[in-house]
Amino acid sequence: MKSDSIAVDVPAESSSAIKGKAPLLGLARDHTGSGGYKRGLSIFDFLLRLAAIVAALAAAATMGTSDETLPFFTQFLQFEASYDDLPTFQFFVVAIAIVTGYLVLSLPFSVVTIVRPLAVAPRLLLLVLDTAALALDTAAASAAAAIVYLAHNGNTNTNWLPICQQFGDFCQKTSGAVVSAFASVTFLAILVVISGVSLKRP
C-alpha cells in the first residue's frame, strides 16, 4: 500500500507586505527612544531654571540693597553711594526682576514638558520667551558691568575718578550682583540650546 501524503500550502507573505511592516516597528522603537532622551532634557531644563532663578534673584537683591554712606567732618556732611543714583543700576534691578519673575512663571511649562516630552507647543513657547529673557538679562548685565568697571578703574580721558577705594562695600555688592547676573545669562543660554535640541525631530 502506498501512503497518501497531504500537502498544505501556507501562503507566504509577499515581499511588499514585509517591507510595509518593518518600518512601522522601527518607527515605534525610535518614538520611544526619542521620548526618553527628551524627558531627560526636560528634567535638566527644570533644574537649570531653578538655578537661574537663584542667580537672578541674588543679583537683583544684591544690587537693590547696595548702599553705603561715608561721614566726613560732621554727621551733617556725608557722601552716599546707592544703586538708585545711577539709572543703569536702576534698569539692572528692574530688568533682572522681570527675568526672575518670568523664570518662576515658566516652571509649570517646564513641568509639562517633563510629563509630555514629545509636546511641541510648550517647548516652542519656552524657546521664544527664553530668548527674549536672555536678551534682556544680557543687556542689563552688560550695562551694569560697564558702570562697575568705571567705579573700579575710572577713566583718565574724561577725568572720572574711581570710587571703590572710598566706597568699598558698595563696589563689592555691585560687582557680586553683576557676576550673579552673568551666571543667570549662562543658564538662560543653555536653556535656549536645550529647547532647540528638544524641538529637533528624531
From Swiss-Prot:
Its main location: membrane. InterPro entries: CASP/CASPL, CASP_dom, CASPL. Keywords: Cell membrane, Cell wall biogenesis/degradation, Membrane, Transmembrane, Transmembrane helix. This is Casparian strip membrane protein 4. Regulates membrane-cell wall junctions and localized cell wall deposition. Required for establishment of the Casparian strip membrane domain (CSD) and the subsequent formation of Casparian strips, a cell wall modification of the root endodermis that determines an apoplastic barrier between the intraorganismal apoplasm and the extraorganismal apoplasm and prevents lateral diffusion. Residues 1-40, 112-130, 198-202 are cytoplasmic. Residues 62-90, 152-176 are extracellular. It is found in: Cell membrane. It is a multi-pass membrane protein. Belongs to the Casparian strip membrane proteins (CASP) family. The lineage of its organism: Eukaryota, Viridiplantae, Streptophyta, Embryophyta, Tracheophyta. It comes from the Eukaryota. Homodimer and heterodimers. It comes from Arabidopsis lyrata subsp. lyrata (Lyre-leaved rock-cress). One of its GO terms (cellular component) is Casparian strip. GO terms for biological process: cell wall modification; cell-cell junction assembly. The chain crosses the membrane at residues 41-61, 91-111, 131-151, 177-197.
